Amino acid sequence: KPSGYESYKDYDITKDFKDGEKSDAVSHDYLYYSVMSEAQDVMYDYLVKRDKVSSQDLKNDKTKESYRERALQELQAGGYSVKTTIDNAVYNAMQDAASQYGGLLDQGGNSGVEVGNVLMDNATGAILGFVGGRSYENNQNNHAFDTARSPGSSIKPIIAYGIAIDQGLMGSSSILSNYPTNFTGGTPILHDGDKGTAMMNLQEALNTSWNIPAFWTYQMLQRHDVDVEGYMTKMGYKIANYNIESLPLGGGIETTVAQQVNAYQMLSNGGVYEKGYMIDSITDRTGEVIYQHKSEGVQVFSRATASIMDNLLKEVVVKGATTQFHSELKNVNGAAASADWMGKTGTTDNFADAWLFVSTPGITLGG
């Protein structure tokens, strides 16, 4: 971690308010609206609890909407101070990078390609910085927290291999089939147009991100009646149908950057999922802290499973078969490249989406 991470978390959203008036969209950006959205959720919960609103009353949409409006009004005019986890230096550096190099995404005849990134503290889930998009003025969709897309192959270590290892059905040296295979309907399972090869170990399957081994691994989980949904629900995933054959390849899954970063945070945190958050505390005008974030870690994978998966994904980064991240980082910052990196890529059909998630023991960055 760069020095100052623990002390330089000083973005206070309430400083953006002017005379208690509501903000206008022109003067704010992704940061303001992302923080405000989470702060409104926190304030809503506080007001409902303070006023002892019953669960029965909250079934009334008008009551819920009324309290959401009150939550926003309280934040804007109630004299509250909202402290976040956002590190200004980190956040600004991420915006500068997106601004200076975002144009590279438009090469090759592409135009308007968007970007979303999240940087998360592994031990706590604190979000230290993010990129919501290339330009809030041109596109108000928040590609870090709101836009949901297929995760492609980046889901393989989470929904297939990780669960199989955790269930004792697979080990780090397991041999898997990559022989040509079809989906039930007869469509070949391809990898960059390749129909498959032969048997291979798990490390090779991950390094190249072959699809067929992940397919068969998920089939094995289903044959053994493994509660895959139980695992995924612990991490906040909402998947409508767990019987989709292409699920371990990203089919039938829609996820945000923040959600997927959180899954890799779990792998780098001994299997403990710490839900990502930006609101550290809210203090009222008298100085009383009405909200303080508290850790509610959930053990998703065993520590042993997380360690095995972490080691496998280290070689994925170092070998560089699917990403040049490590070699390019060496050229830019040798000290940063020497960190204990692990990670995984993911792409969707016709490269509509391209993902990369990388972690050190301290932080996870992805998008």
Task: Tell what function each PLM region has.
Residues 1-81, 85, 233-234, 238, ...:
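Non-catalytic, structured segments within soluble enzyme domains
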Residues 83-84, 116-120, 127-131, 174-175, ...:
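Structural recognition of the beta-strand scaffold that forms the well-ordered cores
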Residues 84-105, 117-119, 130, 137-147, ...:
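A penicillin-recognizing enzyme superfamily signal
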Residues 106-113:
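Short loop/turn motifs at secondary-structure junctions and domain boundaries
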Residues 187-190, 194, 222-262:
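Mid-domain, small-residue-enriched loop/turn segments at the edges of structured enzyme/sensor domains
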Residues 31, 35, 39, 86, ...:
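Stable alpha-helical elements in mature extracytoplasmic
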Residues 94, 125, 149-176, 205, ...:
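Active-site SXXK
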Residues 22-23, 169-228, 244, 273, ...:
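Conserved catalytic neighborhood of penicillin-recognizing serine enzymes
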